[in-house]
Amino acid sequence: MRTSLLFYRTSKNANKEASVLSYELLQKAGYLFKTSKGIYSYTPLFQRVILKMTEIIREELNAIGGQEVCLPLLQPAELWEKTGRWKAFLSEKLLYVLKDRENKAMCLAPTHEEVVSEFVAQWLTGREQLPIHLYQIGTKFRDEIRPRFGLMRAKEFLMEDSYTFSDSPEQMEEQYAKLRLAYQRIFDRLNLKYVIVAADGGKIGKGKSEEFHVLCSLGEDTICVSGSYGANVEAAQAIPPSYVYDSNLLPVEEVATPNIRTIEDLEVFFNTPKHKILKTLVVKTRQKDSEKFFAICIRGDRQINLTKVASFLQVDDCELASEEEILKHLHVEKGFIGPLYCPIPCYADETTRPMTNFICANNQKDVHCKHVNWGRDIPLPAFGDFLLAEAGDLCPQNGGAPYEIFQGVEVAHIFNLGTRYTESFSVGFQDKNGDKQLCWMGTYGIGVGRTLAACIEQLADNKGLVWPLAVAPFSITILYNGGDTEGEATALQLYQSLNTEGFEPLLDDRNERLGFKLKDSDLLGIPYKLIIGKSFQSTGLLEIESRSGEKCNVSPENLLDWCSKNLPCHTRKIPPLREQN
């Protein structure tokens, strides 16, 4: 490709909304055009990157027996109602919903578990067809409340999603292991630093689940890592620091605490450390059409983990109750909620069990109690793990070694779903006794755009993008000084030679200074620059510079040999482009 024929535009300044590096550079380098908030057009440059990324995905999934399909973007509500997810997704207001001319409710696909389950249920004829692995690479939709960070959180995005159907839990685990390894190979080919962490399945499913996170400072997710074990902070099991509490139980006392609402205020008012204060939070849960409220007690120095609370209570969703809801159901203002005389069911974190003579609210405004004790002043509640893991907490999966905390961007998620969806759609087969057996299902997904954005966040430098060679739009840029007729002739000859051999060069044939072209090549993130500069006239040697700054010299006669050792060769050669008039 010649730069003069490439439809692109670079810019010195990015959109004012470009709050992250990846979004800023994709716009400045001419890869991305903002059509609307959270909706983007991919330019020819970015489409080349996308095609290479998706080709890597196809190669790895085909290698383990995956079969590519194309599932509909428009889905009927009745399929989602079979699994109970229609109302669950509607409650989050993230689903694009519409009605057809027959007034039937439809949605734009955020995922495809229901559609693929219906498909396989109709076509599966026998156990001998199992396991089945179907995958697609296509568009998904999510009506984000606050679309931001460019491709990190968009309303319309590109995903690879895989679905496996197996005849047993053991076969399901085998498929899970195959997909997990295939995903590792995909990210390894991009030379990314990433971790695989235990995760919560959320609304997709409650079975075994892991996330792939690319490590970078921007990361929206907090990752807990200890040795070879890692977990999303929402799923991480942790052993917090323990404390020794009083053995001599003191009489409970009510204390006036006018407008003392926060743990920090109580710490100062009572001159006592936070771990001796009991914090009570009210959560609202949803299970199908039912909403309930619960009180959750945790130590004052810790934060609540709503994902763990939802799992403990076995509900679909869980969130902190609003001030209005607290006032309505407990008849007390936020900041004065406690387990004493609590009118709603109350549970406590395991770390509160040894607490004695603690301070807590008693559901009266401007009043707290001190010297409160479990069993004596408050009936012993059911205890569970309700805490977010923190740096320094001990990891039970790694022999009690401490956690380190990192930020990561989730780029892939894999799940074992069991029979949750296959039961709803009767996806199964007859066993040797003639009895119907349900299939065991897995679902897996890679965010293509998120992966590329995370790649930029991790690898880019102050000069611009730094694409891995595997997905760069072009492998090498051929550069010469504008107006240098001899350099132009040499560049054209080299371009035609590399192009014919499938090395995907970009010939910068603009009438611009060499320095300008060099900066543009760095901004675009092209892995190598082939420079026909002043030294070529005296030495006859070409200069090759990598994006990382490493340099070498090569003669025109040995250029193809160098390329064959350092650049990918695409077997489908790019046909010669038309010459300019």
Curated annotation (Swiss-Prot):
Keyword Ligase: yes
Record-listed E.C. numbers: 6.1.1.15
Coiled coil: none
Family per record: Belongs to the class-II aminoacyl-tRNA synthetase family. ProS type 1 subfamily.
Broad class of enzyme this protein falls into: ligase
Annotated organism of origin: Chlamydia trachomatis serovar L2 (strain ATCC VR-902B / DSM 19102 / 434/Bu)
Database matches in PROSITE patterns: AA_TRNA_LIGASE_II
InterPro entries: aa-tRNA-synt_IIb (IPR002314), aa-tRNA-synth_II (IPR006195), aa-tRNA-synth_II/BPL/LPL (IPR045864), Anticodon-bd (IPR004154), Anticodon-bd_dom_sf (IPR036621), Pro-tRNA-ligase_IIa (IPR002316), Pro-tRNA-synth_IIa_bac-type (IPR004500), Pro-tRNA-Synthase_IIa_type1 (IPR023717)
Protein name: Proline--tRNA ligase
SUPFAM superfamilies (alphabetical): Class II aaRS ABD-related (SSF52954), Class II aaRS and biotin synthetases (SSF55681), YbaK/ProRS associated domain (SSF55826)
UniProt free text on domains: Consists of three domains: the N-terminal catalytic domain, the editing domain and the C-terminal anticodon-binding domain.
Function: Catalyzes the attachment of proline to tRNA(Pro) in a two-step reaction: proline is first activated by ATP to form Pro-AMP and then transferred to the acceptor end of tRNA(Pro). As ProRS can inadvertently accommodate and process non-cognate amino acids such as alanine and cysteine, to avoid such errors it has two additional distinct editing activities against alanine. One activity is designated as 'pretransfer' editing and involves the tRNA(Pro)-independent hydrolysis of activated Ala-AMP.
One Gene Ontology molecular-function label: proline-tRNA ligase activity
Pfam families: HGTP_anticodon, tRNA-synt_2b, tRNA_edit
Assigned GO CC terms: cytosol
Keyword annotations of the record: Aminoacyl-tRNA synthetase, ATP-binding, Cytoplasm, Ligase, Nucleotide-binding, Protein biosynthesis
Subcellular location: Cytoplasm
GO biological process, one term: prolyl-tRNA aminoacylation
Reactions the enzyme catalyzes: tRNA(Pro) + L-proline + ATP = L-prolyl-tRNA(Pro) + AMP + diphosphate
Subunit structure as annotated in this protein's UniProt entry: Homodimer.
Keyword Disulfide bond: no
